[in-house]
Amino acid sequence: MSRIGKRPIEIPSGVKVSYVTPILKVEGPKGSLLREIMSDIALEIEEKSVSVNRADDAIKSRSAHGLTRTLINNMVVGVTKGFEKILEINGVGYRAEAKGDVLSLSLGYSHPINFPLPKGITVEVDKMTKVFVRGIDKELVGQTAAKIRSFRGPEPYKGKGIKYADERILRKAGKTGKK
């Protein structure tokens, strides 16, 4: 039995969970999310909890058991609290600016990068060097933050580029050169 999969998911007040095979819908104060559930997984929806069970002990079912439980829990947390990733921009002349549903980045290239934000994602820029990526879908927030970071990842010599706020960059010593 999966240690993660066997734990029930608590449903807070104000959250509504409905399941019409194979689509699970979670609605809350911040919005609603849909996810397709594998046919090998069975859901038991009660008043204040959701239990995830597997139909058989096949390898595919066992591997999806804990994953499905975690994905559903992330949906519940997303519609109640939401998710956030913080990116920091380091470097001379590197800056970000939010213009509606487009994030404009100046990262030392000959042209600015205009990144269109996916639906359901909001971006807030603080002092042109901190970017807050927020949304209710954890997967989409992480994916969007990773795409923004990929435009100019941090380099190990001076630490210039875009990095996550909690990320630690291992610095390298430069060449010593001939003397």
Swiss-Prot record:
- Reported function: This protein binds to the 23S rRNA, and is important in its secondary structure. It is located near the subunit interface in the base of the L7/L12 stalk, and near the tRNA binding site of the peptidyltransferase center.
- The source organism is Geobacter metallireducens (strain ATCC 53774 / DSM 7210 / GS-15)
What are the protein's GO molecular function terms? rRNA binding; structural constituent of ribosome
The protein's name in its UniProt record: Large ribosomal subunit protein uL6
Top-rank taxon? Bacteria
A GO CC annotation given for this chain = cytosolic large ribosomal subunit
Q: How does it assemble?
A: Part of the 50S ribosomal subunit.
Which UniProt key words apply to this protein?
Ribonucleoprotein, Ribosomal protein, RNA-binding, rRNA-binding
List this protein's GO terms for biological process. cytoplasmic translation
